């Protein structure tokens, strides 16, 4: 079960400072010609939930490991599984926008030490979407960091498309008005019968 837990507008450094040295970030991008974004979308999945998902992928029960070290570092195999999980999530992320705009998200790479990498301007505005994930025996959080400039560009594109749609709607209204005002002869046959006269 997944539901939106929070949406916050922050500066990037507030998101970055909340990450620990052992945290892993997935970087994603939008594949769309008119929205070539230089800033990545950052995705952070809490390690306990991530390990539960991996265990279930490998046929396990997804039992949480209560003895997990807070500074646990993912193995190479786990990093590959992490990339697979994020790649699958990208398809669903695109579907969440499809009523407004067609966006295709794709996985770019994984950062194993995000505290040393400046991916977005330190003072840039970002929107953090927190998704609460619940399994029968585990729960945790997935956080998506969406650059404010990217969202502004997306909303601008949506506004343009809405403007084009309303123009099309105006023309269709004109067409219907001219059809209503036109003269049209209608002949209808209600029934046919045969009568014998004998």
Label for each model-derived stretch:
Residues 1-198:
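N-terminal auxiliary interaction/assembly segments of multi-subunit proteins
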């Amino acid at each position: 079960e997944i539901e939106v837990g929070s949406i916050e507008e922050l500066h990037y450094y507030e998101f970055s400072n909340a990450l620990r040295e052992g945290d892993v970030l997935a970087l994603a991008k939008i594949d769309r010609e008119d929205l070539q974004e230089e800033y990545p979308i950052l995705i952070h999945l809490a390690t306990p939930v991530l390990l539960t998902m991996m265990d279930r992928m490998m046929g396990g029960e997804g039992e949480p490991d209560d003895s997990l070290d807070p500074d646990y570092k993912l193995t190479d195999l786990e990093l590959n599984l992490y990339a697979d999980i994020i790649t699958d999530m990208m398809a669903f992320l695109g579907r969440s926008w499809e009523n407004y705009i067609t966006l295709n998200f794709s996985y770019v790479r994984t950062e194993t030490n995000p505290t040393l990498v400046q991916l977005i301007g330190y003072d840039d505005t970002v929107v953090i979407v927190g998704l609460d994930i619940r399994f029968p025996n585990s729960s945790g959080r997935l956080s998506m960091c969406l650059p404010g400039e990217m969202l502004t560009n997306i909303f601008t594109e949506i506004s343009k498309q809405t403007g084009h749609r309303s123009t099309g709607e105006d023309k269709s209204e004109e067409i219907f008005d001219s059809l209503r005002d036109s003269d049209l002869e209608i002949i209808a046959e209600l029934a046919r019968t045969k009568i014998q006269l004998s």
